[in-house]
From Swiss-Prot:
UniProt entry tagged with the keyword RNA-binding: no
GO BP of this protein: fatty acid biosynthetic process; phospholipid biosynthetic process
Enzyme class: transferase
Purpose: Catalyzes the reversible formation of acyl-phosphate (acyl-PO(4)) from acyl-[acyl-carrier-protein] (acyl-ACP). This enzyme utilizes acyl-ACP as fatty acyl donor, but not acyl-CoA.
PANTHER family: FATTY ACID/PHOSPHOLIPID SYNTHESIS PROTEIN PLSX, PHOSPHATE ACYLTRANSFERASE
InterPro entries membership: FA_synthesis (IPR003664), Phospholipid_synth_PlsX-like (IPR012281)
Cellular component GO terms held in the UniProt record: cytoplasm
Protein name per the record: Phosphate acyltransferase
Keywords: Cytoplasm, Lipid biosynthesis, Lipid metabolism, Phospholipid biosynthesis, Phospholipid metabolism, Transferase
Length: 368
């Protein structure tokens, strides 16, 4: 196995993603296979595969395409699913830690892991730190809707948020939607208990007012309710981590219930089975639309580097999709674009309050 750094190994025109080979329920097998699938779709991408070399060697022999586009860095320790974040922070030779360190040292532009969520979030925040002007990173993910894929954030990284946090999430969501969903002017909504302007608490109303006077004013739809998420009223739904996580888990539970009910209904009688055969084409499209693998890959946005969290129980196709998300974020310079968005917000805030300090931070701090 090559010991040189990923940055040395590949030419300057390619970008490198660090892969935590040991994270997830079925690692490292599905990780290497998923990386191989992603490599076929993205021939310019290169990988720094971090994990136990003795386990990775036979897998890379099985997937020569993956072997040809990666270097391996030995990491003998795995962060387990039951491990507390504090314990994971002490494991300096874990595959997760070394993969994130590679991003911090400039050897990789992003990291993908299917490992312990709490440990990944804690390590990423401490090692990579937030971008200038960002108070807190947010967890963002793609979800299905009646009008196509949408983006929602925060999904649980921040339970309590102030107005400025929500505005930062909107800026980061705008960049994510442009980078991954390919939208030129994503419509942005704030999740609230009603769509009327007077609804919600001071925190959510202040955030809405800040967005109406920001560079995202033309894209800001206003308040959205729970049913607007599935309806696709906006392309980006912004929420605090408490509300966002509940909305996500509710959507996942509803999708599972729907799948179970359809299976129960279409296997209940002979006529029902016949009905399934007649409706098979449409039902297969519905199954594909609801396939969680299509939406695998939540991103911790707002850090100095791209961090993608894959579902721990996914298969190779699902992990490959998480890698796809990481590649989209890196190739579209998402971190740079978030910096630009924050700079515009500060500039507009300063222009609106010229008597305050030059960078507008007094007005922004007032919103906390």
């Amino acid at each position: 196995m090559a010991s040189k750094t990923a940055a040395d190994h590949f030419n300057r025109d390619s970008f490198v993603l660090a892969i935590d080979a040991m994270g997830g329920d079925h690692a490292p097998e599905i990780v290497v296979e998923g990386m191989a699938i992603a490599a076929e779709r993205h021939p310019d991408a290169r990988f720094l595969l971090v994990g136990d070399e003795t386990l990775l060697a036979p897998l890379l022999a099985r997937w020569p395409r993956a072997a040809s586009v990666c270097t391996v860095r030995h990491a003998p320790v795995k962060v387990t699913g039951e491990m507390k974040a504090a314990a994971a922070l002490r494991l300096r030779d874990s595959s997760m830690r070394i993969a994130i360190d590679a991003v911090a040292h400039g050897e990789a532009s992003g990291v993908v892991s299917a490992g312990n969520s709490g440990a990944l979030l804690a390590l990423a925040k401490i090692i990579l730190k937030t971008l200038p002007g960002i108070d807190r990173p947010a967890l963002a993910a793609i979800m299905p809707s009646a009008r196509g894929d949408i983006l929602m954030l925060d999904l649980g990284a921040n339970v309590l948020c102030d107005p400025r946090n929500l505005v930062e999430f909107a800026i980061m969501g705008d960049v994510f939607a442009r980078s991954v969903l390919g939208l030129t002017a994503p419509r942005i909504g704030l999740l609230n208990v009603g769509s009327e302007e007077q609804k919600g608490d001071d925190r959510i109303r202040t955030a809405a007012e800040m967005l109406r006077t920001s560079h995202l004013a033309q894209q800001f739809h206003g308040f959205v309710e729970g049913h607007d998420i599935a309806g696709g009223t906006t392309d980006v739904v912004v929420a605090d981590g408490f509300s966002g996580n509940i909305a996500l888990k509710t959507a996942e539970g509803t999708a599972k219930m729907l799948g179970g009910l359809l299976k129960q209904i279409f296997t209940s009688t002979i006529l029902a089975r016949l009905g399934y055969l007649l409706a098979r084409g449409g039902l297969e499209r519905l199954r594909e639309w609801l396939d969680p693998r299509r939406y695998n890959g939540a991103v911790l946005v707002g850090l100095n580097g791209v961090v993608v969290k894959s579902h721990g129980g996914t298969d190779a196709q699902g992990f490959a999709h998480a890698v796809d998300v990481g590649m989209d974020m890196v190739s579209n310079r998402s971190s740079d674009r978030i910096r630009e968005g924050i700079a515009k917000l500060v500039e507009l805030s300063g222009a609106a309050h010229p008597a305050r300090d030059k960078d507008g931070t007094a007005q922004l701090a007032e919103a906390r």
